[in-house]
């Protein structure tokens, strides 16, 4: 069977059905591709034709095969001739790998003149056509001139005192994660939701120099957990990994210091820093939050500011009336950090807050594998896309960097159903200050 035949079989749809072409790079050799009879590409892009009703399934399959969707374009009825597109080189998703080599960039497959029909229109043109109100996204980034930054520097840190250090992982969970609250009285360490602070651990490094600071996302609102403007809190996981050569277990210096610190201990604090993850001032904004593990820290600050009674009383100028949606990825149920808080908010504000878990070691994705956050995003991609199109919507991503590719693939598929190229649309979201990412 030829590659072209495999391609046609994958796109066997009725005349007039909507069809899309995925440009894919980076699919790798694995058990599934080992079972095929087709050659594996070593470089360049693979073009895969997908019917509308299989877009999400194909996107998930491509992600499972290690591929990354670069573009998704529509195929009009005029571009389909006897069920064939005019793209010269195409293949079935499970039969080829397009892994970029050398400079790490994709090398496009040569196409004939018909491929010009798939050229991406300017981003602003797409937004004009596809914005839900028919307007371009002209919202400017929020002015951050009044945001406090670097009030305390490494050479003159603030000395805070530990008030409490409480475990967040329940029995049967994986790893150590602590909620640590510090006393800020006697200083001028002001901060707002979405910022980070630096912690300088005691001691010296292997070169005999003082330990360098580590940054941690703040887990409390500007008013602190007690809503008295006197504290700041962190959500810290003890870093633990195997040394690649010796195989010994290695623990992070600063994370171990913090997760085991005793109340009453003094800690060197710097900052605050960061303007990327700030919550919009508009109380009618919509907020999408995608988090894994301790990436919940800034999301907790947003949710407290939006929904906690004491916070709402302390912020009469900000009474949240929008819609927020948290998709939270964790390995097990005992690893759902702040579970009681989250579910209390969901129960109290069902019309304004939606909570979705992705529990990788307990739940299965549609392919039978582990349910990661990107799988949940794919499951709800159409709903999320409709929300993202609203000019009042801000999206926040915090946690493991590995989730970004799957999230982009899911939203690419959803956007393509309306003829929008996600990568271009995302760039405009960033320019408008509506796409916020803090991953590691």
From Swiss-Prot:
Keyword Thylakoid in record: yes
Positions of FAD binding: 214-217, 235-237, 241, 253-255, 294
Topology of this chain in the membrane: Peripheral membrane protein
Recorded GO MF terms: ferredoxin-NADP+ reductase activity; flavin adenine dinucleotide binding; NADP binding
FAD-binding FR-type domain span: 155-279
Region annotation Disordered: where it falls in the sequence: 99-142
Primary subcellular site in the record, as a coarse category: membrane
Record-listed NADP(+) binding positions: 217, 237, 294, 330-331, 360-361, 370-374, 399-400, 438
Subcellular location per the Swiss-Prot or TrEMBL entry: Cellular thylakoid membrane
Gene3D superfamilies from the UniProt entry: Nucleotide-binding domain of ferredoxin-NADP reductase (FNR) module, Translation factors
Gene Ontology terms: cellular component: phycobilisome; plasma membrane-derived thylakoid membrane
Top-level taxon of origin: Bacteria
Matches recorded under InterPro entries: CpcD-like_dom, FAD-bd_FR_type, Flavoprot_Pyr_Nucl_cyt_Rdtase, FNR, FNR_nucleotide-bd, FNR_plant_Cyanobacteria, OxRdtase_FAD/NAD-bd, Riboflavin_synthase-like_b-brl
Keyword annotations from UniProtKB, A to Z: Antenna complex, FAD, Flavoprotein, Membrane, NADP, Oxidoreductase, Phycobilisome, Thylakoid
Limits of the CpcD-like domain: 17-75
Matching NCBIfam families: FNRPetHCyano (NF045929)
Family as reported in the entry's similarity comment: Belongs to the ferredoxin--NADP reductase type 1 family.
Name of the protein in its database record: Ferredoxin--NADP reductase
Species annotation: Nostoc sp. (strain ATCC 29151 / PCC 7119)
Name of the gene this protein is made from: petH
